[in-house]
Amino acid sequence: GFNRIYKLFQSKSFFELEKRFSIMWMLDVSHCFDSIYTHSVSWALKNKAYIRKHVTNSNQFGQELDTLMQRSNNNETNGIPIGSEFSRIFAELIFQRIDNNIELDLMDEHGWKNKKDYVILRYVDDFIVFCNNESNAEIISKTINVKLNEFNLQLNKNKFKKYSRPFCTSKTGLIIKVNELIQNLESKLYEKHDGNIVLNKIRNKHDLKVYMINNIKSICLDSQASYSDVSSYLLSSLSKRL
């Protein structure tokens, strides 16, 4: 897997998927963490019928997680805290059940096999669908939404992003521009001679800082992006060069 979604778009596997499939849809779960119902972790680990049958048994793992999550969030059952590692693990338990349900439904209803007839990738609450025609993408997205609904979640249809080959997302374009800026910065900071790195003298550190900040602002403005869209890639790239 990838711990940052931008790493997917730079990976060998992404280009292999682009060779195999002509359609890519990006889908987003609406208000994901705010909408997660804490009891649904028990449904994910077992199923609703089992939980109802054993509702008085309070020492089940799912119920223990449910109770712990409620206590971390003022005893609320609707919504989980955003940002904590526990919340990410809690959500992942639910989403892995949803992933499995989607795959089973597409096989049972349409005879489609994952990684053969289509591929669904997921990064937290973002689904990326690869297939070979719009009608199949529509069926897959509807199936995803139905299976999300079973856990009181739903897709944000205002955030559907649809691409046909070649796949060039706004994120891809953003990363290309940031990478060019970093390479330009490198040329200002040092040069390579016979395999050795020679540091350049920075005559005005303030001017260099302003140059970087203004260029990042310009990239975000041109790409209609925010600092949060570029920060993780920028920090990762800079840390590798320090």
Language-model features, listed with the residues they occupy:
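Amphipathic alpha-helical scaffolding segments
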Residues: 39-51, 96-97, 143-148, 163
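Conserved pre-motif C helix in the palm subdomain of viral-like polymerases
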Residues: 30-33, 75-105
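Glycine- and acidic
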Residues: 22, 75-86, 124-130, 215-219
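Helical (often loop-to-helix) elements that flank the catalytic cores of nucleotide-handling enzymes
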Residues: 131-155
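Conserved catalytic core of two-metal-ion nucleotidyltransferases
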Residues: 149-184
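Active-site palm subdomain of RNA-directed nucleic acid polymerases
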Residues: 53, 89-124, 129-132, 136-139
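Conserved two-metal-ion catalytic palm core of "right-hand" nucleic acid polymerases
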Residues: 1-82
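Right-hand nucleic-acid polymerase module
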Residues: 15, 23, 27, 61-63, ...
